[in-house]
From Swiss-Prot:
Transmembrane segments: none
GO molecular function, one term: structural constituent of ribosome
Protein's GO biological process: translation
Superkingdom assignment: Bacteria
Keywords noted in UniProt: Ribonucleoprotein, Ribosomal protein
Entry annotated with the keyword Ribonucleoprotein: yes
Gene coding for it: rpmB
Keyword Transcription regulation attached: no
Family stated for the protein in its record: Belongs to the bacterial ribosomal protein bL28 family.
Protein name per the record: Large ribosomal subunit protein bL28
GO cellular component: ribonucleoprotein complex; ribosome
Pfam families the record matches: Ribosomal_L28
Disulfide bond annotation, renumbered to this chain: none
């Protein structure tokens, strides 16, 4: 399963960990993904999606109708 948010499209980013001695080591910054079951009223069924914390905030504000459009 890929680490990509269905709603926002967030993916892992790459960068450096920088120590106090200014040593740089490469690292991968993962998005904050969660698997959620969401009820789609139009289709009368549950849909399992991987969404980021930001996407969950968007869904709570706008509702799941926007998500249903993206999943089709």
């Amino acid at each position: 399963m890929s680490k990509v948010c269905v709603l926002t499209g967030k993916k892992p980013k790459y960068g450096n960990n920088v120590s106090h001695a200014n040593n740089h080591t490469r690292t991968r910054f993962e998005p904050n993904l969660h698997t959620k079951r969401i009820w789609i009223e139009e289709e009368k069924r549950w849909v399992k999606v991987r969404v980021s914390a930001k996407a969950m905030k968007i869904m709570s504000k706008t509702g799941t109708a926007e998500l249903a459009k993206l999943l089709k």
